[in-house]
Amino acid sequence: MRKIIHVDMDCFFAAVEMRDNPALRDIPIAIGGSRECRGVISTANYPARQFGVRSAMPTAMALKLCPHLTLLPGRFDAYKEASRHVRDIFSRYTSLIEPLSLDEAWLDVTDTPHCYGSATLIAREIRQTIFNELQLTASAGVAPVKFLAKIASDLNKPNGQYVITPADVPDFLKTLPLAKIPGVGKVSAAKLESMGLITCGDIQQCDLAMLLKRFGKFGRVLWERSQGIDERDVNSERLRKSVGVERTLAEDIHEWSDCEAIIERLYPELERRLATVKPDLLIARQGVKLKFNDFQQTTQEHVWPQLNKEDLISTARKTWNERRGDRGVRLVGLHVTLLHPQLERQLVLGL
């Protein structure tokens, strides 16, 4: 039986800001956007969350909920440095580390000799070490499979941990809401609820063939997760699939020249972000995204082996002319899809 830990830093970006500026600790703060510009909240601290401010919330909505919210632009170099330090702490216990983002990762500690082989003690020690060395707190979940470890890490936040032993799994799953399963969004959860399927216990009573018919491959995933099945390994070579940069605009734009000027400003940041990726990752495709003032969005990309500003501008112009109509544009984005060298042959054959 495997021993999987999911570590999730507590309101990470905001926590770094509060650590470096103690005056921010007891007031509502959020990273992302500004009072003058549109945007979305990246992270909010717990005082802000008491007002209902959440990650991915439009900044304007956050300010309505909490008018005295302090908005910070973000210091991503500081966040990356803290993330590297946390990753170094993980590596003292295992080489099987799968980062999901700067602030969370899975660890497989099945075969580690540390802490007498106890995943519970390892998680506790990792969290304490993070606090001692970085003055930041983390929460953790311990379970025999990845998805349960991730769910567990959210059950005793902040600065806590939750353990699901193999013996606990059946009872835990019986009452677990399907909406808690990673990958089950609001739309899927609503559809399941309309069928009388609310918990994993409900899915356990279902016929797999029916789930496959109604939900396709996702039906199998639902059935497996509801049985506690998750055979995915902790993948220390997990590939980053894409790199992108986008800008939500203070005012909608209606002229192509304005869009082109924004792309000119975004392109150096895309180059910078791409430079931080492992050098053996190649570009498979590059593309653009436009979001309109009716909140509809469109993405267009094509195969292109090298980052090329002129090609991105050409793609954006084509998208602008063919898909915008008379709508204003409120967001412009650039992105590249990455290709691992081992998969290059597969992509070429697939064309």
Curated annotation (Swiss-Prot):
InterPro entries recorded: DNA/RNA_pol_sf (IPR043502), DNA_pol_Y-fam_lit_finger_sf (IPR036775), DNA_pol_Y-fam_little_finger (IPR017961), DNA_polymerase-Y (IPR050116), DNApol_IV (IPR022880), IMS_HHH_1 (IPR053848), Rev_trsase/Diguanyl_cyclase (IPR043128), UmuC (IPR001126)
Site (Substrate discrimination): F13
Subcellular location(s) per record: Cytoplasm
MF (Gene Ontology): damaged DNA binding; DNA-directed DNA polymerase activity; magnesium ion binding
Database matches in SUPFAM superfamilies: DNA/RNA polymerases, Lesion bypass DNA polymerase (Y-family), little finger domain
One Pfam family hit: IMS_C
Cofactor comment: Binds 2 magnesium ions per subunit.
Gene Ontology biological process terms in this record: DNA-templated DNA replication; error-prone translesion synthesis; SOS response
Source domain of life: Bacteria
Keywords assigned by UniProt, alphabetized: Cytoplasm, DNA damage, DNA repair, DNA replication, DNA-binding, DNA-directed DNA polymerase, Magnesium, Metal-binding, Mutator protein, Nucleotidyltransferase, Transferase
Keyword DNA damage found: yes
Cofactor(s) needed for function: Mg(2+)
Domain UmuC: 4-185
Class in the EC hierarchy, top level: transferase
Keyword Cytoplasm recorded: yes
Active site: E104
EC number: 2.7.7.7
Cellular component terms per the entry's GO annotation: cytosol
Family: Belongs to the DNA polymerase type-Y family.
Protein name (record): DNA polymerase IV
Species the sequence originates in: Salmonella arizonae (strain ATCC BAA-731 / CDC346-86 / RSK2980)
